[in-house]
């Protein structure tokens, strides 16, 4: 297979960075298709930890190019900060390519995000306030500024002046906030465009050419399927399509070009921000998992909400994203536990259901139906093969695979690349 997609199958933070780094060592190209610097990913390599929000994880290993596609929204300041940190640590970034059709997060988008969230009061979504949503709003409203616009001084000036009129009207008259000044933005962002120029190309052509040549291309999804703008827990979702279908439009490839879709999940479930979470643990067990696994947001630093593994949510993700392989992370967290629970269904108003409701009110009334399994005492962080795993760990993994209806391809027992048990090679599925 030459096209493998990696998507988060929960609410993000599943550890996609690790599996994409692991797979990218065999890839000619690693491609990101959606989101922006609201999507944190952590990579541990040779004792060094890299926390990134925008540059694709494949930057560490992909042989030819690392690509930021047209579906990504780019904060230039964040991007150049990450590039500088990578280069300072000896990582070659010369293969980075940026779509000329990608949209730019402008200062007014960040302000709008902040003001909108503030105005919602108790109904706030829990946005990272990085301007992601407003940038996608600009895109849908056809007033967005794209990378290609940033490279053309006259075009950029015209669009910026027009947009500032629109945004300042909103800021001053609706939110009662000060107007932004053209001169505080124009020179700085035009300079970003000039610095960006060497990376910019038509990435749709680049990626399709690689696929036509049967090169291995790894597609990195951001966030998680349960945050998808259409299929997630709306309105507590992100602003882009995080399912595998969003990869095609976010890169500019045909939907039939993906060979394999790997869904990444944790051995439990986490969520950041507001929204329904049927298996959430608000007790000592939840606190224990959070501290063992250091469940704090890469972007925000906020403590993540923690719950038991939810197979109902995973089956939903499998269906809407066409997942045909599971990559499970953080199995080692349960070493030393007595029992582990898996949610097998929900109870809604006294009725047992096995699907994920669209209605928020229904979701908030759902109670998880649990199956309890024994855990294990052994430290598994040095385990290299399936046969070395404790029997109870194998039973837990097999039950997850059975409930979701998807085979496991990798199991992670620690943060490093080497702490990965490979059951099936995604490149050969």
Curated annotation (Swiss-Prot):
<dbReference type="GO" id="GO:0046040">
    <property type="term" value="P:IMP metabolic process"/>
</dbReference>
<feature type="binding site">
    <location>
        <begin position="412"/>
        <end position="414"/>
    </location>
    <ligand>
        <name>GTP</name>
    </ligand>
</feature>
<keyword id="KW-0460">Magnesium</keyword>
<dbReference type="GO" id="GO:0005525">
    <property type="term" value="F:GTP binding"/>
</dbReference>
<feature type="binding site" description="in other chain">
    <location>
        <position position="238"/>
    </location>
    <ligand>
        <name>IMP</name>
    </ligand>
</feature>
<protein>
    <recommendedName>
        <fullName>Adenylosuccinate synthetase</fullName>
        <ecNumber>6.3.4.4</ecNumber>
    </recommendedName>
</protein>
<feature type="binding site">
    <location>
        <position position="13"/>
    </location>
    <ligand>
        <name>Mg(2+)</name>
    </ligand>
</feature>
<dbReference type="Pfam" id="PF00709">
    <property type="entry name" value="Adenylsucc_synt"/>
</dbReference>
<feature type="binding site">
    <location>
        <position position="142"/>
    </location>
    <ligand>
        <name>IMP</name>
    </ligand>
</feature>
<comment type="function">
    <text>Plays an important role in the de novo pathway of purine nucleotide biosynthesis. Catalyzes the first committed step in the biosynthesis of AMP from IMP.</text>
</comment>
<dbReference type="GO" id="GO:0004019">
    <property type="term" value="F:adenylosuccinate synthase activity"/>
</dbReference>
<feature type="binding site">
    <location>
        <begin position="330"/>
        <end position="332"/>
    </location>
    <ligand>
        <name>GTP</name>
    </ligand>
</feature>
<dbReference type="InterPro" id="IPR042110">
    <property type="entry name" value="Adenylosuccinate_synth_dom2"/>
</dbReference>
<feature type="binding site">
    <location>
        <position position="304"/>
    </location>
    <ligand>
        <name>GTP</name>
    </ligand>
</feature>
<keyword id="KW-0479">Metal-binding</keyword>
<comment type="pathway">
    <text>Purine metabolism; AMP biosynthesis via de novo pathway; AMP from IMP: step 1/2.</text>
</comment>
<dbReference type="InterPro" id="IPR027417">
    <property type="entry name" value="P-loop_NTPase"/>
</dbReference>
<dbReference type="GO" id="GO:0044208">
    <property type="term" value="P:'de novo' AMP biosynthetic process"/>
</dbReference>
<dbReference type="InterPro" id="IPR018220">
    <property type="entry name" value="Adenylosuccin_syn_GTP-bd"/>
</dbReference>
<dbReference type="InterPro" id="IPR001114">
    <property type="entry name" value="Adenylosuccinate_synthetase"/>
</dbReference>
<keyword id="KW-0963">Cytoplasm</keyword>
<feature type="active site" description="Proton acceptor">
    <location>
        <position position="13"/>
    </location>
</feature>
<feature type="binding site" description="in other chain">
    <location>
        <position position="223"/>
    </location>
    <ligand>
        <name>IMP</name>
    </ligand>
</feature>
<dbReference type="InterPro" id="IPR033128">
    <property type="entry name" value="Adenylosuccin_syn_Lys_AS"/>
</dbReference>
<keyword id="KW-0436">Ligase</keyword>
<feature type="binding site" description="in other chain">
    <location>
        <begin position="38"/>
        <end position="41"/>
    </location>
    <ligand>
        <name>IMP</name>
    </ligand>
</feature>
<dbReference type="GO" id="GO:0005737">
    <property type="term" value="C:cytoplasm"/>
</dbReference>
<dbReference type="InterPro" id="IPR042109">
    <property type="entry name" value="Adenylosuccinate_synth_dom1"/>
</dbReference>
<feature type="binding site">
    <location>
        <begin position="12"/>
        <end position="18"/>
    </location>
    <ligand>
        <name>GTP</name>
    </ligand>
</feature>
<feature type="binding site">
    <location>
        <begin position="298"/>
        <end position="304"/>
    </location>
    <ligand>
        <name>substrate</name>
    </ligand>
</feature>
<feature type="binding site" description="in other chain">
    <location>
        <position position="128"/>
    </location>
    <ligand>
        <name>IMP</name>
    </ligand>
</feature>
<comment type="similarity">
    <text>Belongs to the adenylosuccinate synthetase family.</text>
</comment>
<keyword id="KW-0342">GTP-binding</keyword>
<dbReference type="InterPro" id="IPR042111">
    <property type="entry name" value="Adenylosuccinate_synth_dom3"/>
</dbReference>
<keyword id="KW-0658">Purine biosynthesis</keyword>
<feature type="active site" description="Proton donor">
    <location>
        <position position="41"/>
    </location>
</feature>
<comment type="subunit">
    <text>Homodimer.</text>
</comment>
<feature type="binding site" description="in other chain">
    <location>
        <begin position="13"/>
        <end position="16"/>
    </location>
    <ligand>
        <name>IMP</name>
    </ligand>
</feature>
<feature type="binding site" description="in other chain">
    <location>
        <position position="302"/>
    </location>
    <ligand>
        <name>IMP</name>
    </ligand>
</feature>
<keyword id="KW-0547">Nucleotide-binding</keyword>
<feature type="binding site">
    <location>
        <begin position="40"/>
        <end position="42"/>
    </location>
    <ligand>
        <name>GTP</name>
    </ligand>
</feature>
<feature type="binding site">
    <location>
        <position position="40"/>
    </location>
    <ligand>
        <name>Mg(2+)</name>
    </ligand>
</feature>
């Amino acid at each position: 297979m030459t096209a493998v997609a990696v998507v988060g199958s929960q609410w993000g933070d599943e550890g996609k960075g690790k599996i994409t780094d692991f797979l990218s060592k065999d890839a000619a190209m690693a491609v990101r298709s959606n989101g922006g610097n609201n999507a944190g990913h952590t990579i541990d390599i040779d004792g060094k930890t890299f926390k990134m929000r925008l540059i694709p994880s494949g930057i560490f290993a992909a042989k030819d190019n690392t690509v930021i596609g047209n579906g990504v929204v780019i904060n230039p300041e964040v991007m150049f900060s990450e590039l500088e940190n990578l280069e300072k640590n000896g990582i070659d970034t010369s293969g980075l390519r940026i779509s000329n059709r990608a949209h730019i997060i402008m200062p007014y988008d960040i302000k709008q995000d902040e003001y909108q969230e503030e105005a919602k009061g108790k109904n706030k979504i829990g946005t990272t306030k990085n301007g992601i949503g407003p940038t996608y709003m600009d895109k849908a409203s056809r007033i967005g500024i794209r990378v290609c616009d940033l490279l053309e001084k006259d075009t950029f000036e015209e669009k910026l002046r027009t947009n500032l009129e629109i945004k300042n009207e909103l800021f001053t008259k609706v939110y009662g906030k000060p107007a932004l000044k053209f001169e505080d933005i124009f020179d700085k962002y035009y300079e970003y465009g000039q610095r960006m120029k060497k990376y910019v190309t038509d990435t749709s052509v680049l990626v399709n050419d690689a696929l036509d040549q049967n090169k291995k291309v790894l597609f990195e999804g951001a966030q998680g399927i349960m945050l998808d703008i259409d299929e997630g827990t709306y309105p507590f979702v992100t602003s882009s399509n995080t399912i595998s279908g969003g990869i095609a439009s976010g890169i500019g490839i045909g939907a039939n070009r993906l060979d394999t879709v790997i869904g990444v999940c944790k051995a439990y479930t986490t969520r950041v921000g507001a929204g329904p979470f049927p298996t959430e643990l608000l007790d000592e067990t939840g606190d224990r998992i959070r501290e063992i696994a250091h469940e704090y947001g890469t972007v925000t630093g906020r403590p993540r909400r923690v719950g038991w593994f939810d197979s109902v949510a995973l089956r939903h993700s499998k269906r809407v994203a066409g997942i045909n392989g599971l990559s499970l992370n953080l199995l080692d967290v349960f070493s030393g536990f007595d029992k582990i629970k898996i949610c097998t269904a929900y109870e809604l108003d006294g009725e047992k259901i096995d699907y994920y409701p669209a209605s928020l009110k229904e979701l908030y009334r759902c109670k998880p139906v649990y199956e309890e399994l024994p855990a294990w005492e052994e430290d598994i962080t040095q385990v290299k093969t399936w046969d070395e795993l404790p029997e109870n760990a194998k039973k837990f993994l097999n039950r997850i695979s059975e409930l979701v209806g998807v085979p496991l391809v990798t199991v992670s027992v620690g943060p490093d690349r080497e702490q990965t048990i490979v059951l099936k090679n995604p490149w050969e599925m």
